[in-house]
Amino acid sequence: MRLMKRILSAAAVLALSASLLVGCSSGTASSVPVSASSAAESTVSSVEETASSAVDENEAAAAQLLNDLTGSYQELWPVILADEYQQTWLDDCTALVGEENAEAAFEKLSSMVTGDVYGEDAVEAYANGGGAYFCGFTNDLATLTFDGETSTISGTDKDGNVLFSHTYHYIGMEPVRGLYEFQSDDADSGEFTYFFLAPDTSAETYHIEFRYGSDAEALSQYDTGEYAYWLASGISTDCDQTMIDNCIELFCTENLAG
């Protein structure tokens, strides 16, 4: 939900982009004293070790995330936006913005995550402003399953037919939003070649957020390209009333509080 919170905030001004600036300087060897050169070499070595350590930590965290995600997931929003939970939404909104504003807040929040277009169609539709995210599953996916022990991600359609089942390996981090990037070990994985996973789990945020597709670069873009205005959200197929209540409360709090 932390990722969706950032996206909703940015979507309000249609500014889902950021830049990472890296500076460096260099000098000639002849103009650097031996002591300074040694110090520089030591600094470079230290930076390299720190970077290597960060990579190791991210890779370990990615493996842990797959373990924590072990289980099966269905689309989030059809579950928690069902009519039977509307009063829960209104109660949580009331606690944050007051009874007189609760219904409007609920309508606004729900509208931002229930868009019905994504990709280039969404880019065209929202060219003059506005915009809502499509947060469902794509490519006929109905149930997504993680097996952390074998690093396997698989999916089935609404009839239970297997759409894909591959082992995946960690390939890096998305620097802006902190998604863990995984790539299939199978050459022909189509739209399930890459999975970008937010660090959300059922235990901590009561839901998960992720993207998947065949183009890693396009998956890093949120307001352009074939995956624009799309962020899949899921909830455990074993979710209970408590998990649903907690998920609704978290979403309201992160987007309406203070």
Can you describe what each PLM-predicted range is?
Residues 125-258:
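Calycin-type beta-barrel ligand-binding domains and close structural analogs
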